[in-house]
């Protein structure tokens, strides 16, 4: 099944990330649904976002519960088959989502990931390097957590391990995906600008 604007929700976990999140939200097509999980009790911040942006739902966790809990809360609130986990310190290129939509129709996947426009595959072990320069996607064992698209139907309820506060929660998720025999891909030509670790 192909990812589209109608069956995708973008989930962003923040903690008072006002300085960076607006650049992120401004880079997202306003027609795409967005869920913001603010890991604090600052309702003024989330209200500003709701007042300014379309198709956005904001929730306050009350305190910093970590990335795993925040992402799981966003996934639980989402109503679409696909979710895109996105850090607030990322900026999508103009064609990032379109390239994800196009490539997704030819792949059976649990997780897809665009890459940073500064990346040249330094953190990925490509499983089959044959003709990799000509391919638009590669199967890998894991992807970085700042941007990943998840097919919720490939999971048995459990997504991120809530006992992992941050940094390794995406590695654990990818490991469990591979143990189930599901596939993870990176998309070479779907790129984003990752500014740095400014989420929680």
Where do the PLM segments sit?
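Short, flexible, basic/aromatic active-site loop/helix in glycosyltransferases
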Residues: 122-147
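A conserved acidic beta->alpha catalytic loop
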Residues: 27, 36-47
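Conserved donor NDP-sugar-binding/catalytic core segment of glycosyltransferases
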Residues: 90-125
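Short, well-formed alpha-helical segments that are part of the catalytic scaffolds
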Residues: 12-30
């Amino acid at each position: 099944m192909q990812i589209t604007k109608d069956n995708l929700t973008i989930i962003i976990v923040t903690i008072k990330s006002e300085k960076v999140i607006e650049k992120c939200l401004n880079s997202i097509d306003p027609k795409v649904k967005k869920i913001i999980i603010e890991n604090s009790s600052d309702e003024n911040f989330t209200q500003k976002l709701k007042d300014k942006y379309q198709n956005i739902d904001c929730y306050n966790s009350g305190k910093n519960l970590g990335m795993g809990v925040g992402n799981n809360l966003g996934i639980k609130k989402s109503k679409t088959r696909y979710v895109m986990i996105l850090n607030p310190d990322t900026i999508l290129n103009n064609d990032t989502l379109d390239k994800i939509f196009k490539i997704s129709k030819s792949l059976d996947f649990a997780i897809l990931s665009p890459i940073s426009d500064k990346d040249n595959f330094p953190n990925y072990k490509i499983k089959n390097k044959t003709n990799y320069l000509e391919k638009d996607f590669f199967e890998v064992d894991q992807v970085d957590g700042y941007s990943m698209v998840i097919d919720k139907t490939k999971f048995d309820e459990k997504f991120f391990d809530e006992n992992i506060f941050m940094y390794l929660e995406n590695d654990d998720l990818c490991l469990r995906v591979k143990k189930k025999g599901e596939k993870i891909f990176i998309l070479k030509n779907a790129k984003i600008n990752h500014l740095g670790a400014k989420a929680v």
